[in-house]
Amino acid sequence: MINFGVIGYGYWGPNVVRNLDSLEDAHVLAISDTSPSARARAHKAYPATRITDDATEVILSTDIDAVAIVTPVWTHFELAKAALENGKHVFVEKPFTSNTAQAEELINLAARNSLRIMVDHTFLFTAAVKKIKQLLHDGTLGKLYYYDSTRVNLGLFQHDVNVVWDLAPHDLSIIDHLIEQDPEEIVATGQTHLNGFEDVAFITLYFPDGVIAHVNVNWLSPVKVRTTLIGGAKKMLVWNDLEADEKVRIYDKGVQITSREGMYNLLVNYRSGDMWVPKLDQVEALRVELSYFVDCITQGQTPFNDGVAGLRVVRMLEAANRSLQQRGVAVPV
């Protein structure tokens, strides 16, 4: 049994507590939050659990094995560092840290103390992303050409980060997981309209072998859109995460150049075949992720979404921010 302390009971924290509480080999012993209303909600939902306003109390508790940090990114480093120094495994909400130096320090600290870090990249545990990764690995899609994502909605405006640091970690972690290569350069453009932070942004990532990824993130959209297009040499797919049933659609469509003899003799064959929808398991990704974290702790394994994976995403976020500040200058990663 792994005993958890959860720090942060705002928007995402209740989901973390609920899913940990549902696992047979995990138990939430303590919840901390600085907000009186959040603590009241936690006490009402879990009257037998210790509720406190002091995160340090949770971190220092000798009966707690692991800490879940579900707080704003600017708090992640200090909380995670204290937890690791006190022998606690750490599950931390995305993005991992505010900068790469902090991420590297936490990774080294965890390694010295033989502790596990897991960064909450929840989408990697969805049935859709698992299926897409399988389709790439087994060659169904062929050589990958592009990843093109739109992740937009009205709000929720953040007071401490821009839209890139709020929404892009989802796609950047997915891209990192699927492509399995570091981007060579990142170009980002965006604009600030309301609260001093960029609320609209467009990020382009250039990878080796001609692979390109594009991510559109936006807090000022009248509609919520969660759509990703992935194109390969053999097949293409559309992933609409807002679809209840047919989240992933695979299209047997493609283009083949059959002749390059002169500019006006280009022969292009367009292939248009069937569309099919793979069956996806209906599971809550966060529960799968937390169960995997518990297994990694008990079995001494390193999770694939560990601190190093979190560092790669933070490195991409930093590059995107630098490009934003220079109005789209290409930044090496």
Regions found by a protein language model. Give the residues of each.
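NAD(P)-dinucleotide binding in Rossmann-like oxidoreductases
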Residues: 191-193, 211-288
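N-terminal Rossmann-like dinucleotide-binding module
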Residues: 1-46
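C-terminal helix-rich "cap/oligomerization" subdomain common to oxidoreductases
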Residues: 66-71, 288, 292-333
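Rossmann-like dinucleotide-binding domain that binds NAD(P)(H)
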Residues: 154-223, 229, 243, 308
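Beta-loop-alpha module in the N-terminal Rossmann-like domain of NAD(P)-dependent dehydrogenases
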Residues: 16, 49-109
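A contiguous active-site-proximal alpha/beta segment in oxidoreductase catalytic domains
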Residues: 74, 97-159
